[in-house]
């Protein structure tokens, strides 16, 4: 995919995410059930986060240069400590959700487990690509 096509696709998706944020905000206002309201709130926050990521990707792609990686001032040990915290939370929420029968509570605990799994993966990415590996990446 050419950079121009990718840029257009990212911009289109950014518009979509911004629209979704508005839709979910409306659904939060209109919904009375606490679990459904929480789900819509999470979806709204995720859409907002997706917009942030898309804006970063658009900026990153627009530079068309080698990015000079600024140092990430974290130690390997600190990253491993954070990863351990996320892994413990993942195990806790996964085990708890396996013991729950109520579908709404099971959904909430499963959402938390999924988020903890993503957090672990993101921390691992930072560790591997910004702390342990010190090379320049072409945009």
Residue locations for each model-derived region?
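Non-heme di-metal
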Residues: 1-139
């Amino acid at each position: 995919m050419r950079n121009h096509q990718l840029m257009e696709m990212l911009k289109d998706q950014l518009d979509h995410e911004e629209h979704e944020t508005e839709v979910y905000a409306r659904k939060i206002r209109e919904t009375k059930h606490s679990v459904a309201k929480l789900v819509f709130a999470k979806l709204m926050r995720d859409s907002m986060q997706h917009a942030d990521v898309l804006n970063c990707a658009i900026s990153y792609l627009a530079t068309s240069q080698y990015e000079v990686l600024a140092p990430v001032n974290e130690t390997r040990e600190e990253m491993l400590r954070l990863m351990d915290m996320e892994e413990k939370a993942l195990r806790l929420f996964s085990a708890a959700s396996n013991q729950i029968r109520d579908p709404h509570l099971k959904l909430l605990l499963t959402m938390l487990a999924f988020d903890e799994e993503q957090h672990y993966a993101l921390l691992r990415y930072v560790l591997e690509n910004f702390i342990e590996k010190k090379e320049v990446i072409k945009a």
